[in-house]
Amino acid sequence: MNPYVPVVNQKISFCKMLLNEGIKKNRFSKKKAAVQIQAALFQSAIYHLESAYIFYLKEIGHTYRCKDIESINSLKKLQSALININKIATEHDELELLLKDEQSWLSLLLAEYKKL
């Protein structure tokens, strides 16, 4: 079994919980403290989603039996790892398309993460 699958799922689950909590805070109060808590929850969700993305890259690397999976922390590093073992991953190509589109959910997520 791929050890990265449960980590990716856990990060996404944490993100859902944080977003639900942030939505609740927004519904019940407009006080400054509640707004700050909501912002903190949403920023935490961005951290978890970015982390899920990195672990997903590692998951792909593990699936294709790349070497030094722990060093994969970007799409370029995944691509290098795949080239080193003469493999092509359609998942990589799909992610690359998303990153080329500045308005894709992945590009927007990573742009927000860089702002934090």
Where are these regions (language model features)?
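Charged alpha-helical initiation segments
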Residues: 1-40
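Short, flexible coil/linker segments at or flanking structured domains
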Residues: 6, 35, 48, 83-86, ...
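Short acidic alpha-helical/loop segments enriched in Asp/Glu that coordinate divalent cations
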Residues: 25-30, 57-77
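Short, hydrophobic, well-ordered secondary-structure elements
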Residues: 41-61
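A structural signal for well-ordered alpha-helices, especially hydrophobic packing surfaces
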Residues: 12, 16-19, 23, 49, ...
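Acidic, Ser/Thr/Gly/Pro-rich intrinsically disordered interaction regions
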Residues: 72-116
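Short, glycine/alanine-rich amphipathic alpha-helical segment
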Residues: 35-46, 80
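Short charge-dense sequence patches
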Residues: 1-7, 59, 63, 102, ...
